Amino acid sequence: MADTLKPEAPNPDTDAYAHESELDAHLQTKRMVINMGPSHPATHGTVRLKVELEGETIVKIDPEIGFLHRGFQKSCENVTWTQCLPYTDRLNYLSAMMNNFGFLNAVEKLIGLEIPERAQYIRVIGSELHRLTDHLTCVGATGLEMGGFAPFLLAMEFRELLHDRTAELTGARLTTSFGRVGGSNRDLPEGWIPRVHKTLDQGLALLDEMEGLLTNNRIFVDRTKGTGVISAEDAIEYGYTGPALRACGVDYDIRKTKPYWVYDRFDFDIPVGEHGDNYDRYLVRLEEMRQSIRILRQAMDTIPAGPIIVDDWRIALPPKPEVYGTIEGVMSHFKLVMEGIQVPAGEVYDATEASNGELGWYLVSDGRGRPYKVHVRAPGFPVLAAVPHIIEGKMLADLIPTFDTINMIGGEVEQ
């Protein structure tokens, strides 16, 4: 009889001490749900993290995306192949040239087109400039969000110098829309290479100073070493690429494993971590910046003379004297602008090594001047998908450095 009359939940007035665990389970008094985002300075984009806590331990975390969705893939179906470029800028807006060149490379592969050698060098130079700016933002923000304001200022000072050089090359600091199918729309400005060499000299000094403030800093090391750990096997299962995968000990970089453009002509190393934690991800990015500087110096010192775009009026705009002086030139110009490049029917997948990993493009053409389908495999989505696996059961304080070092960019994740 006593058992049948016993209430389902303990009476908090009389049984709190005797049945504390049952009471907690019934009333959920020890757990709290907080929101990180969708507008939060540490999320690197408008993403919401719904975090369930027990004390300061993360019991469950649920990433919610969609706040930055712009309909990228559908938008590309309504414009010409060239007009897709401004949309690609806004995927990873910290390294827009990598998006531009990756898309153009896939279109050229679909056409079966090889671009001039000088244009390939220009693409390598632009890509490595933006790899530097992306990594500087990631490393600087990681230090800032753990209390290190000086490293952030050093990173931003170097990044500003790089933005100045980028603006001289492309006409824009961030969203560049640089390059065209068949090569480049601009050549390197006169006197630009010596200015970049000087910028890299200044940047190396800033990089050394930033490393001195972070790498052996006890607070930074305690917050990053042994936190945010993911094994190489799990990273591969989730689809990790780029610095996050290499920090786990996997030596995979498309520039080495499947070289494109002229990367196979340069002497550079691929930094690989060991433990797959936040500290290794920081170290990998730090060393990648030094390797990018090596590549830039070699590319600028050995860039050949020659054309920067193919001499084919079906692909590239005719020279202005031909447009103004010949009927063939003006007709080719008009058809290319109004109808777009007529890409042969077919499909292709092509990938380049972007700052955060493999940036893959799956393109389908039906033979017209507009894409039938554009799908982008962004490196940020797999690293975000693995956040619950990495962080559940860990401390709330570990979430910020983990989210910083995986460097999820909302623009490429949500498209």
Swiss-Prot record:
It is found in: Cell inner membrane. It holds the Pfam family Complex1_49kDa. It is an enzyme of class 7 (translocase). Its main location: membrane. Its EC number is 7.1.1.-. Signal peptide: none annotated. The keyword Aminoacyl-tRNA synthetase does not apply. InterPro entries: NADH_Q_OxRdtase_suD, NDH1_su_D/H, NiFe-Hase_large. It catalyses: a quinone + NADH + 5 H(+)(in) = a quinol + NAD(+) + 4 H(+)(out). It is a peripheral membrane protein. The keyword Transport applies. One of its GO terms (cellular component) is plasma membrane. It comes from the Bacteria. Keywords: Cell inner membrane, Cell membrane, Membrane, NAD, Quinone, Translocase, Transport, Ubiquinone. One of its GO terms (molecular function) is quinone binding. NDH-1 shuttles electrons from NADH, via FMN and iron-sulfur (Fe-S) centers, to quinones in the respiratory chain. The immediate electron acceptor for the enzyme in this species is believed to be ubiquinone. Couples the redox reaction to proton translocation (for every two electrons transferred, four hydrogen ions are translocated across the cytoplasmic membrane), and thus conserves the redox energy in a proton gradient. NCBIfam families: NuoD, PRK06075.1. Belongs to the complex I 49 kDa subunit family. This is NADH-quinone oxidoreductase subunit D. It comes from Myxococcus xanthus (strain DK1622). The gene is nuoD.
